[in-house]
């Protein structure tokens, strides 16, 4: 475990989590719960958005109807920053997810100290004992944990670790190829007590409507929004399109 400073602990203690999972479930009851992702770059696409202003993006996405925000903080592969997380949280009332490769509990304390309300744990990147330990640390800090799985084995591990917010990622981490059908294959394996989140490959309101019909409650969308000239407008159109399809 890395060194935990008193100042970091105090900053974490000062942040009162906003309830990431609760927000998703509340919005999903009557609407379309989108987790809008602030992502400057990615390993597969390179630079996605040169004009990357977290505060402005967060405000626009909240006004457009996002249920929550996801903020990339990994510097090496996504050109992210904890500063982006803090700025997004300060500029919006929405709960924020720290999206990073979290492997040590100090990163959880860092997340809360920088105003995160939830963290991402990638099942494929962790041994089971690590997954269980990090989940417990985050929950003890009052943070929600989005456990990301790519197949049935990883899903079972996430459930065994006590995760109640499950993300199914349709992107293959080895090839970066996206197969949205992966989300449909696994959704029935997720208990109804969990909030089901579909990740990657969502391009249209029709995709959202299909996923909603299959049992998903929330949809993590980043690249298509960040590529748009006005991400807020793009999200508004996406949600409206999904509503039209759902209400047919």
Show which residues each predicted segment covers.
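Short, small-residue-biased leader/transition segments that mark boundaries at the very start
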Residues: 1-2
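Hydrophobic alpha-helical segments, chiefly the membrane-spanning helices
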Residues: 11-15, 19, 106, 115
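Flexible, solvent-exposed loop/hinge segments and secondary-structure transition points
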Residues: 13-31
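N-terminal active-site wall of soluble small-molecule enzyme domains
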Residues: 32-33, 38, 45-146, 152-157, ...
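Catalytic cores of alpha/beta
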Residues: 103-115, 150-161, 198, 202-221, ...
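Glycine-rich phosphate-binding active-site loops on the catalytic face of alpha/beta enzymes
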Residues: 110-130, 167-176, 216-235
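Catalytic-face loop-and-helix region of soluble metabolic enzyme cores
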Residues: 165-221
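C-terminal helical cap(s) of enzyme catalytic domains, especially alpha/beta-barrels
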Residues: 185-189, 212, 227-248
């Amino acid at each position: 475990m890395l060194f935990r400073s008193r100042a970091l602990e105090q900053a974490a203690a000062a942040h009162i989590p906003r309830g990431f999972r609760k927000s998703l479930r509340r919005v999903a009851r009557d609407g379309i719960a989108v987790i809008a992702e602030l992502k400057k770059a990615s390993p597969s696409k390179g630079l996605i958005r040169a004009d990357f202003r977290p505060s402005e993006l967060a405000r626009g996405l909240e006004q457009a109807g996002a249920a929550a925000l996801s903020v990339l903080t990994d510097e090496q592969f996504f050109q992210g920053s904890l500063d982006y997380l803090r700025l997004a949280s300060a500029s919006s009332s929405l709960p924020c997810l720290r999206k990073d490769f979290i492997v040590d509990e100090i990163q959880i304390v860092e997340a809360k100290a920088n105003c995160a309300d939830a963290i991402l744990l990638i099942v494929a990147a962790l041994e089971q004992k690590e997954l269980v330990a990090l989940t417990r640390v985050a929950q003890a800090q009052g943070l929600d944990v989005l456990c990301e799985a790519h197949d049935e084995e990883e899903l079972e591990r996430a459930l065994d670790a006590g995760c109640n917010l499950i993300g199914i990622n349709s992107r293959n981490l080895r090839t970066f190829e996206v197969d949205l059908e992966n989300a449909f294959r696994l959704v029935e394996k997720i208990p109804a007590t969990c909030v089901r989140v579909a990740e990657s490959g969502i391009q249209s309101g029709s995709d959202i409507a299909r996923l909603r019909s299959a049992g998903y409650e929330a949809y993590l969308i980043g690249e298509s929004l960040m590529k748009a000239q006005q991400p807020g407008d793009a999200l508004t159109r996406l949600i409206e399109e999904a509503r039209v399809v759902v209400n047919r």
